[in-house]
Structure formats: structure tokens, C-alpha cells
């Protein structure tokens, strides 16, 4: 089974009812499967922070949302994540392609890769990095966990730390 099929099956198994996507070469196969499936509402976004708003609306309308995006846009989504998704405790799995690793041909992608995990850690958002195709087999359990609790823990006091 392809990684795209594993991702699609995991979303169906976890009753994902709404997906927004931003164009991504690495995730183009799964985006195409979502578009063709008819099993969930798919609304392409122009920007990742716009997608956060769409996902919040879908959640408030009774659907389980997910967003598919690139890690290079984490910087522009920080405000939407903190003041919308986290503040209103919206569970939102983010399937993020990870640009900028060894072999990346685009230099600016490398710079954001250096900061991606640290930015998500700062927001207390757990991350799971798939290095091999078979790692995607964990996605159904990860999605299930993500929908049991909000995307992050927001009720922390200054002296507490994030729990992942």
C-alpha cells in the first residue's frame, strides 16, 4: 500500500470530515486522493493561516478537520495556531511535509527546517516525524490521539512545562 493510501485510509478511519490543503509537491499524491475520494470536504487554501481559519469553522460546524501544508509556512501560522486553534482548544492534526532536510535543492527551505520543530515545541504541539514509508503506519493511532485532546495544552502556568 502506498503512503498516500495509508494517509487516506487513516483519515477515513478517524472520521476526518474536512481537509484544507496548500499546494505541496511532496504531498501532491495524497491531496489528489482527497480531492477524488468524495469522502470528506476538501477546500484548498491560498495560505496556511487561512487554512487554520477554515479548519476552525469546520470544527465549529461539527466536522473533524485536518490541514495539509509545508513546514516552511509554520512561521506565518504561529498567530493563527496560538490565538485561534489553541485558544479555542480545537483538535487539528497538521500533516506537514518537511522541506529543508539533507539534499534539499532550495536554500530558503533549509533555513525554516532548522526552526520548525523548535517553533512547534514552543507552542507545546507534539510532533511525529516519519523518516521511512512504514512510519506512516502509525498515523491512524496518531490521528486518534489528536482528536481525543486539543492540538496542544494551553492551560499551563508559567512554571509548568509542556507535556508531550
Where are these regions (language model features)?
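Conserved thiamine diphosphate
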Residues: 108-145
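Single conserved hydrophobic/aromatic residue that forms the stacking wall/gate
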Residues: 155, 160-164
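Short beta->alpha linker loops
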Residues: 2, 22-26, 46-50, 72, ...
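N-terminal glycine-rich anion-binding loops that anchor highly charged ligand groups
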Residues: 18-32
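Thiamine diphosphate
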Residues: 28-99
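Short active-site oxyanion
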Residues: 15-19, 40-42
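A short acidic, helix-capping loop that chelates divalent metal ions and anchors anionic groups
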Residues: 101-104
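N-terminal amphipathic/basic leader segments beginning at the initiator methionine
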Residues: 1-9, 14
Amino acid at each position: 500500500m502506498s503512503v498516500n493510501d495509508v494517509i487516506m485510509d487513516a483519515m477515513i478511519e478517524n472520521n476526518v470530515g474536512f481537509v484544507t490543503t496548500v499546494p505541496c509537491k511532496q504531498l501532491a499524491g495524497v491531496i489528489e486522493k482527497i480531492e477524488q475520494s468524495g469522502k470528506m470536504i476538501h477546500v484548498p487554501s491560498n495560505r496556511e493561516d487561512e487554512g487554520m481559519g477554515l479548519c476552525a469553522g469546520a470544527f465549529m460546524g461539527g466536522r473533524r478537520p485536518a490541514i495539509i501544508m509545508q513546514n516552511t509556512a509554520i512561521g506565518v501560522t504561529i498567530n493563527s495556531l496560538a490565538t485561534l486553534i489553541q485558544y479555542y482548544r480545537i483538535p487539528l492534526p497538521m500533516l506537514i511535509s518537511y522541506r529543508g532536510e539533507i539534499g534539499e535543492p532550495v536554500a530558503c527551505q533549509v533555513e525554516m527546517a532548522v526552526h520548525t520543530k523548535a517553533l512547534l515545541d514552543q507552542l507545546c504541539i507534539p510532533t511525529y516525524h516519519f523518516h521511512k514509508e512504514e512510519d506512516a503506519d502509525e498515523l491512524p493511532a496518531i490521528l486518534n490521539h489528536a482528536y481525543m485532546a486539543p492540538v496542544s495544552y494551553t492551560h499551563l502556568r508559567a512554571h509548568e512545562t509542556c507535556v508531550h
